Amino acid sequence: MVQRHVGRCARPGFLSPRAALRRIRNGAAAFACAAATPAIVFAQGVADAADAPLLKPIAVDGRRETGIGPIDGIAAEVSRAGTKTDTPLVEVPQGLSVVTRAQMDQQDVHSVGDSLRYTPGAYADSRIGGVLESVFLRGFGGFAAAAINPQMLDGLPLPKGVNWAASVVDPSTLERVDVLRGPASVLYGQASPGGIVDMVSKRPTRDAQRLLAVQAGNRDRAQVAFDFSGPLTQDGQWAYRVDGLARRADAQADFSKQQRVVIAPSLTWQPNADTRFTLLTSYQRDPYNSFAGWLPALGTLRPGPAGQIPTHFFPGLPDFDAYDRKQAMIGYAFEHRFNPTWKVRQNLRYTHLDVDFNGAAVNFNAPFVAPGVLNRSLSWAREHVNHVALDNQVEARVLTGPVEHTVLAGLSYEHAVATMSASGFGAAPPLDTRQPDYGQPFAVPPLAQQTRQTPDRLGVYLQDQIRWDRWVFTLGGREEWARTVTDDRLNGASARQSERAFTWRAGAVYLFDSGFAPYASYSTSFEPTLGTRFGGQPFTPTKAEQVEAGVRYQSPDQRQMASIAAFDIRQRNVLTVDPAHPFFNVQSGEVRSRGIELEARARLGKRLDVIAAYTYLDTTVRADSNPAVVGKRVAAVPRHLASLWLNYDVAWQGLRGLSVGGGVRYIGRSVGDNVDTFDVPAVTLVDLALSYDLGVERAVLKGWRVAAHVNNLFDRTYMSSCFSAGGCFYGPRLSVTGDISYRW
């Protein structure tokens, strides 16, 4: 099997004799790829090869890039997120970006949301705090319990509880983060029309590597991390990896802190080149996580009669607020190739998630009881989730005349049991923003609901990647059945909701020898909607469709990649308030998101890394039961996002091993509510990074590295987003970290 693309190695697959000869004539890189093609394929074209020029043999490293393995540098060549097969990014007819481990290390990211700051189409800074990593993709997102989180890990969905329980993965355990923008239900089932974030776990390596790192920073940040990996047997059939960290830090708001302990052991058994079984496990405990409460626009975004509310102001109850998360996962990834045609994969994961939540928050509908005095409420919830996700795949690579087919058939299943015991909203004592009194007595509200929710989802899908000459066509369809049973244990009631949806995608890419690849696609998605109308009829799924067109570029050496895309997404059956029965909803809403995305990732020369991105978004409400919001922009979605990251490896004598990096992020203006009564101003932020590999100049210090990172260098005070006049979030202030590590 070889990696194939016009003029360069790019994907495993068959070559027709004529196509192979054309690639050989393109140069040595193509010759190296073609040399690895199964002999039976080339045997068909021996006669045609007589006139081919003889080139100097080139050694080829058998460790080609895959969609789940390490990436050399900041530009990935292959991804599984867009097709569930190892496919070059230039052959995927949809917006797709990959955040590599090298980029995460350069920027010292502390959350998956942090890793997306330099990615087009993504806005992950809508609120601070490590409870829920709310991510907006192509204008679609949410807040609080409705937040859209990075929801895929190793191609499998992560669990979501009834309300506040959500899985969060620490980026230190990840090899890469793939962002597929636009509807992805054809492969992954129910999903936001904005796209998915698929996180890929670190896996055992064939070569031994060991890392210990210590980090400190402002706000009393302290962290210890480790990463050990390597073979367990001399023949390399067994390999292990254990990575993790322990961290504590004060959060930006008073009385808030973040604590985390995570460990992720994994084990790989590879008896031969055709079979691989990897056991993936992890345990994460967030004993105290900052629940960053919202504040009113008056006093933060706009001057208030009581003055400015400081960024460190805590609107909650110090003796009550808490978010304690325990998360344990065990699963495996199995892959076996029977022959050059047939391959099977099976991915399975079980997740147990416990969340204890206590929180006091500002009543965003009526934030003040008097000038400068906040109106608050409090609630609590105890949630437990047991979740199983399974994905079976059969892949076949066949030739039909001059046409190559990569056919993927799959069956996925997801089952969860989520329970929640929770209060209603109780009254919390008012809080004066000028002289806050956190010692006021309060009453914890009693138990108000006990819910057990059991969702089951079964999906079958079929995809064909068709390669004919310079064309690559991707066709796929999926049928999914979803059933959710909700039991009200307090009142003895039960509700059952069953849904069925078909989604599909069609796309085409044309591959030029120059490396340019224009593409176009159409795709659909769906999301189940729980609940009923006033008359008791269950809601139907929310559905969306997208049209997208763009151009990608990949240089022959795979060190430079660029893309531009234009898209138009329409989401229908969105819940809106029933005008005849205000305490119920109807499905009369429609949201449209149009935009343009640009991205460039390049290694210029031998020492300079460049990551650039730009996003233009026009996300508006096209239909709603409330005429006041029709035609208005969706809250918290910036119209413009732009970023530039540079990292340079110094070559001066005496400073070799020094890397200097820096980035600029522009977050454009957004609206503060869905009726566009006020705006959230734009802001420009600057980040810096320094690292020094001490062993480059001094052999005695081999393996030692020191680094420093600064986010929001000029300590800008800004609002990251608002969802109403009573709900706004301050953006993160200046963050400084320094670390020292030893690798051997």
Task: Give the role of each language-model region.
Residues 98-101, 106, 117-118, 134-183:
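Periplasmic plug
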Residues 247-251, 263-270, 274-337, 355-385, ...:
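Acidic/polar loop-and-plug regions of large Gram-negative outer-membrane beta-barrel proteins
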